[in-house]
Every structure is written in structure tokens, then in C-alpha cells.
């Protein structure tokens, strides 16, 4: 995590207080010590400033602000234990003093003593509610103890105070992703046979273009007693991508039969019309969805366009432009399909509602049935904390579908708090947290566009989520700022490889290795690229050179070496390498590979055991990393 860097400005305010207000009758020697401390501090000489403060504390041990400033100098020079001692002494003299509480909490966060940090950071936040750093530190402490929801609340408060702080946006985005993982664990443990879990699994497969697996998961979800609204429509989109248009039409119409206001089904029919060359009919459906709820279409226009042939998109654009010129459709409708940034739309994007209106609330169900999701959300959101479960379900649905993911997330939290609606609540919390994470991380990137480190961190997160184009974009931003950054080159090569751009990945890895021929991580990625190109003989040397890589990459390198040996008929060596990778098998494919090798040498008992473990890991694999697993190394093309 990136270190909070506000100590100098806080110190300065205390020095001014000491010099100008608190102790006007001090001897000249004492005043000189404080002035010297301030001067050293202003020029960044924290060692010297600390020595002056130490002498001042010796002269006046009863002044808590002096001890606080001494602690800050220790903090700035990395003397953590001395800083903690000084802050504690200041707090004993004046328990509510803001600075020592804040920085003692920050020190404990830095040392991963999160439970000790929380009370100090809470006290700092209470004594100075407008300080973003107190809320940011508190969020980090809550995240450290695994209380992701409280962490998110603290980050949101920090964001309200300082919306231009890239650190806050970054931590908020990461916290949302951690909430997704936490929800996945609960869903897997308590609700693995729920229609909401199967629908979530299907949604994830669909996002990864694993349409065969998505179809199976949607069918399973639809066979259960309850499942999310629009599941038939979502299944229809998968069938469109598999070019089964008649079955897709059946699913869209089935959705409309039970859910007449489904804009997702309407959008699906628009996609069907376009696939069949019925452009005017497609535009009518799109215009109808936009009229009902612009926020819905803004959130789903990219989904509508995904996988469409370029010529069909061109024809759609032509007809939309003609209708816009004639006044038949609004200007913003065309903008949605041209990827115009939201800040250039003329219609107002949905926001979290505030004012209560009981007459609107009574009409929420009617709004939903008409596809007016934003109006439905606005009607219910002001009473979120008092709504009964039936209305919470409706609010979560309407808020998410209208693109108001902040409200959807808060509503889902309430649903998840009850055992009767936990699975449904976690479904909506996961869906909305994914969207919120993407938005927060993108905002962090915009605000701190000059930081290669942040772009690399964002690239890593996108790559882990299998959002490879976004990952590539972040790595390239980092390389624009620092062309020889090894971390960016490493991440970019992996993202390109995972996205099927093997030649470009090879080009990037080769360029990186020219400057860093002995870098173990770059050698590892070069070995992986050559494995993907079936150049196992070429890969072997690079992989052996990468065996002194970071511990977190160690199992993966052994798994790749195992693959090299297996493909070059060195079965025993392959088994030995794969054994070293088994402990890190998150999706079951390494156990599957070693099981096949055991069969090859006639060891059926070991093979059966490895197959059993592979199956168990697969069944448990709800997280994004596990969802992508197939009985080979990658999802098969579909």
C-alpha cells in the first residue's frame, strides 16, 4: 500500500501553535529550539528537527504537542518504535489530541497491528471529521482485519471529504474487489445450490466469453426455484453469441412473459433484429429502452455491442445518425454507441436519491414493471434503512439496472444481513461491487496519471480480473511515463499473452530482456510465452533461469517446467516439477495434469487421488480466478 504522506503539513500547524499562541512567556532558548526545529522541518531535515524537538521535550515534558511533533519526526525518519512511544506519551497528557492519535493509528497500520490502530484512528476521525487521512487510515485498518464493509464506509467518507485524492479512490476500488471475494466465499459455503450463485457463476463465464460454460450455468440456475430477474434475458445474450438466434429469441420472450418491463430482454431483441439485418426494428427497440431508462442503456450499451460484426455496428450508427438528424431519436442515444464520455451526455446520470416521497414509493412496483428503473430506485432509496425485504429486493434490482450501483450496494448490504435473503443480497452486492471497483480504479488512474506505480498496480488488478484490454492500457500508461519499467513490461507481456496476443507479448518480452537479461520474472514470462507457442525446447532455458524468482511466482514456474517436460516425453521429471506446484493450484488444472501423467506411467491410485482433488477444487472455484479453469490451461475458444 502507498504510504500516507501528510506529516509535514500537520507538523507545521503544531509548530505555529506552539510559537504563536500556547506559551508566549517561554525563555529565548526554548523559543530558539522551536524556531530551529521549524526551520529544519521546512527544509526536510527531519533528523535535525527531531533532535531539536527532543531537547524541547526535555525542557518541557508537560507539553503534549512537543511530544507529538517529536513523534512525527521519528515517523518521517522511519523510527517506528520511537514514534509510537512519543505519540503514546502525548496522548496520555492530552487524550483527544488529533495528531498523535492519527499518526499512532497510521504507525500501527504500517506495522499491520490493525486492531490496535482502530481506536486511535476513530478518535482522530471524531476529533476532526473533515480530515480525509483519518478516514483513509481507518479504512486501511478495517481492511486489515477483514471487515471490508466498514473499510468501504471509511473510504467513502474520505472520498466525500477529498474527492480528488487518488489514494482514496485506489483503496476504495481494492476494497470493493475484496468484498467480491469475501461474498464469493460465503456464497460457496452456504448457498452453493442457490439459483443466485449459479446465475453469478454464469454471468462471470459470460463476461469471460466462456459461452459454453455460461450456458450450462444459466440452465442450471433456471432449473432452480428462484433466480435473479433477467436471467432468461442474460442467457439469451449468451445464445446470441453462440449464434443460436432462435433459442435466444425464445429466452428473451420468456423473460418478457414473466417480466414485461425487462429492458434487458428488449435490448436482447434489438440485438437479434440487428443480427438478422432488421436495423430499423433494432433501433426502435433501442429507442424504447432509452426512453424508459437512459441509465439502463448507458450501463448496457457496451454489452449490446460486444461481439457484433463491424459492418453491423456501422449500419446501426448510420441509422441512429439519420434518426437523430430527423429528430426521431435524441442525440445522447447515438453518443452511447459511440463511446462518448459520460460527462458529455446531456441527460443526467442516476445518483443516489435523498429526499423521501411516499407517493412515489407506493408506485415503485409500477415503475419497475414499466422499465422505469431510475424512478423505481429514486422512489425507494430514501427509505432504504427501513424498507421490508420485498421492497429491498425491488430497490436492489432497480438501482443496479439503472446504473445506480452505489445504492444497489447499500441495499444489498441490508439484504445480506438476513439469513432469509443472504444469497440474493450477496448476488447484488457482488454485481454492484464489481462495477464500483472498476469505476473507482479508473478514477484513481485519472487523478494520479503521472504515477507509473499506480498504473502498474491497476494493471495487475485488471489482469487478475481478466480485464485484459484495461490491464494493457494501464501498463502502457506506465511505460509512457517510464519506458524501461520492468514491472510494467512484465505485466504487459502477461496481459497480452492472456488476451491471445502472443506475437505482441513475445515482442514486448524480448525487448524487456535486452535490457534485463537476468531478470527472473522476465525470463519466466518469456518461458510462458514460448510454451504458449509450443516452443517447449526454447522455453526450458528461460524457465530454468527464472527459478530464483519471487516466492509468489515459484509454483507457477515449476508448473510451466512440468509442462515442458511432459511435452518433451520426460514424464518423471514432469511429475517432480508439478508436485512442487500443487500447493498453489487454485483452479484444479495442475492436479488434473499430474493425474494424466500418473496414468501414463501406470500409477492409477495416484491418478485417481489427483483427479479427485482437481474435481473438488473445481467445485469450490467460484472466484474469478477459478471460474476460468478448464481441463487444460485456458478456456477453450468458443
Give the role of each language-model region.
Residues 69, 103, 137, 171, ...:
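Canonical tetratricopeptide repeat
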Residues 30, 64-65, 98-99, 132-133, ...:
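Helix-start (N-cap) detector for alpha-helical repeat units in TPR-like alpha-solenoids
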Residues 156-162, 170-178, 190-191, 267, ...:
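TPR/TPR-like (Sel1-like) alpha-helical repeat modules
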Residues 59, 93, 127, 161, ...:
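Structural marker of alpha-solenoid helical repeat scaffolds
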Residues 41, 68, 75, 92, ...:
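Position-specific recognition of the canonical hydrophobic site in helix A of tetratricopeptide repeat
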Amino acid at each position: 500500500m502507498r504510504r500516507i504522506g501528510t506529516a509535514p503539513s500537520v507538523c507545521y500547524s503544531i509548530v505555529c501553535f506552539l510559537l504563536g499562541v500556547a506559551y508566549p512567556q517561554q525563555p529565548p532558548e526554548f523559543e530558539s529550539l522551536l524556531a530551529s526545529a521549524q526551520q529544519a522541518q521546512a527544509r526536510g531535515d527531519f533528523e535535525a528537527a527531531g533532535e531539536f524537538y527532543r531537547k524541547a521535550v526535555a525542557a518541557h515534558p508537560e507539553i503534549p504537542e512537543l511530544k507529538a511533533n517529536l513523534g512525527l519526526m521519528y515517523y518521517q525518519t522511519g523510527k517506528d518504535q520511537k514514534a509510537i512511544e512519543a505519540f503514546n506519551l502525548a496522548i496520555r497528557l492530552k487524550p483527544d489530541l488529533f495528531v498523535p492519535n492519527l499518526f499512532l493509528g497510521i504507525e500501527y497500520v504500517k506495522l499491520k497491528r490493525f486492531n490496535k490502530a482502530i481506536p486511535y484512528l476513530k478518535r482522530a476521525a471524531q476529533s476532526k471529521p473533515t480530515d480525509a487521512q483519518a478516514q483513509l487510515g481507518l479504512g486501511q485498518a478495517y481492511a486489515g482485519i477483514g471487515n471490508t464493509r466498514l473499510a468501504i464506509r471509511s473510504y467513502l467518507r474520505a472520498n466525500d471529504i477529498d474527492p480528488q485524492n487518488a489514494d482514496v479512490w485506489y483503496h476504495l476500488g481494492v476494497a470493493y474487489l475484496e468484498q467480491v471475494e469475501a461474498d464469493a466465499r460465503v456464497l460457496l459455503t452456504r448457498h452453493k445450490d442457490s439459483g443466485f450463485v449459479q446465475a453469478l457463476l454464469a454471468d462471470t463465464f459470460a463476461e469471460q466469453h466462456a459461452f459454453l460454460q455460461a450456458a450450462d450455468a444459466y440452465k442450471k440456475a433456471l432449473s432452480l426455484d428462484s433466480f435473479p430477474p433477467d436471467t432468461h434475458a442474460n442467457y439469451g445474450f449468451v445464445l446470441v453469441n453462440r449464434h443460436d438466434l432462435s433459442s435466444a429469441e425464445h429466452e428473451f420472450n420468456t423473460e418478457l412473459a414473466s417480466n414485461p418491463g425487462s429492458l434487458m430482454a428488449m435490448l436482447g431483441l434489438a440485438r437479434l433484429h440487428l443480427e438478422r439485418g432488421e436495423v430499423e426494428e433494432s433501433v426502435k427497440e433501442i429507442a424504447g429502452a432509452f426512453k424508459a431508462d437512459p441509465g439502463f442503456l448507458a450501463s448496457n450499451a457496451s454489452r449490446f455491442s460486444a461481439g457484433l460484426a463491424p459492418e453491423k455496428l456501422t449500419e446501426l450508427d448510420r441509422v441512429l445518425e439519420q434518426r437523430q438528424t430527423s429528430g426521431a431519436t435524441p442525440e445522447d442515444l447515438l453518443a452511447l454507441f459511440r463511446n462518448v464520455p459520460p460527462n458529455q451526455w446531456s441527460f443526467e446520470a442516476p445518483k443516489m436519491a435523498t429526499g423521501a416521497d411516499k407517493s412515489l414509493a407506493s408506485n415503485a412496483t409500477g415503475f419497475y414493471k414499466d422499465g422505469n428503473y431510475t424512478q423505481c430506485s429514486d422512489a425507494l432509496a430514501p427509505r432504504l434503512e427501513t424498507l421490508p425485504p420485498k421492497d429491498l429486493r425491488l430497490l436492489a434490482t432497480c438501482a443496479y439496472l439503472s446504473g445506480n450501483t452505489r445504492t444497489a450496494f447499500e441495499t444489498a448490504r441490508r439484504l445480506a444481513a438476513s439469513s432469509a435473503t443472504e444469497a440474493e443480497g450477496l448476488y447484488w452486492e457482488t454485481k454492484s461491487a464489481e462495477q464500483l471497483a472498476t469505476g473507482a480504479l479508473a478514477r484513481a488512474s485519472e487523478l494520479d496519471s503521472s504515477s507509473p506505480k499506480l498504473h502498474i498496480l491497476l494493471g495487475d488488478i485488471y489482469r487478475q480480473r481478466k480485464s485484459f484490454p484495461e490491464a494493457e492500457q494501464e501498463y502502457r500508461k506506465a511505460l509512457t511515463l517510464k519506458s524501461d519499467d520492468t514491472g510494467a513490461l512484465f505485466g504487459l507481456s502477461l496481459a497480452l499473452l492472456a488476451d491471445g496476443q502472443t506475437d505482441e507479448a513475445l515482442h514486448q518480452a524480448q525487448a524487456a530482456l535486452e535490457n534485463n537479461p537476468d531478470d527472473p520474472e522476465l525470463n519466466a514470462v518469456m518461458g510462458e510465452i514460448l510454451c504458449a507457442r509450443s516452443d517447449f525446447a526454447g522455453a526450458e532455458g528461460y524457465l530454468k533461469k527464472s527459478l530464483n524468482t519471487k516466492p509468489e511466482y515459484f509454483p507457477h514456474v515449476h508448473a510451466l517446467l512440468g509442462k515442458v517436460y511432459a511435452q518433451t516425453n520426460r514424464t518423471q521429471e514432469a511429475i517432480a516439477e508439478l508436485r512442487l506446484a500443487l500447493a498453489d493450484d487454485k483452479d484444479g488444472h495442475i492436479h488434473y495434469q499430474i493425474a494424466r501423467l500418473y496414468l501414463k506411467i501406470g500409477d492409477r491410485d495416484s491418478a485417481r487421488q489427483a483427479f479427485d482433488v482437481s474435481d473438488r477444487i473445481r467445485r469450490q472455484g467460484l472466484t474469478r480466478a477459478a471460474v476460468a479453469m478448464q481441463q487444460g490451461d485456458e478456456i477453450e475458444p468458443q
